[in-house]
Amino acid sequence: IGLESTILDMTVSPPMILRPGAITADMLEEVIGVVSVDETILGSESSQAPKAPGMKYRHYAPKAKLTIVEGSLKEEVFAIRQLAYEKSRQGVQVGIIGTNETVEFYTHGLVKNIGSRENEKTIARNLYRVLREFDDEKVDIIYSESFAMQGIGSAIMNRLEKAAGHLRISASAVVKQQRYRRVIFVSNTDSYIGPMAAELLRNKELEQ
């Protein structure tokens, strides 16, 4: 499927997944019962060294800095759009890893369609190819959407995490930092404008 195979440690009880791949935890449990997962592949850095080969260091990492943007899909798209816009204005060559469902919403940067979220095998198969293409096109920074930590998605996120050196940012944090320079009030009468403005200022949603 484009990613390395699943590695399962059968010397412990319950058996432990050391590297996620096309054979998912659900598939294994249907055959051998309960399996555990090595904590070093659960999406965060650990003080313990990974047991599986090729899992300790940035694996198949692109030359450009790769950042995973995490949140709801809507938040991720909004955040990546904003980040790409800001970096592009600074003359930075931006790469974006998007999907069938989102690529049309990105207006700045070099956008790569990694596949449909409804077909995770396609995403897994395209991941390393897309990273290599960004190398060939000499982008400076890459922003990637995140994927569900279920099924093959866990393997996709594991490889993305390794390639990014565990660099992740919150999409909602980027959205909150968005500055609004103009607010248009629409009202049938002037009596509503004052309370509307006061409520906005009370909530401190605007950065002056």
Short names for language-model regions:
Residues 177-208:
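Conserved active-site segments centered on acidic
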Residues 1-182:
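Active-site-adjacent structural elements in enzyme catalytic cores
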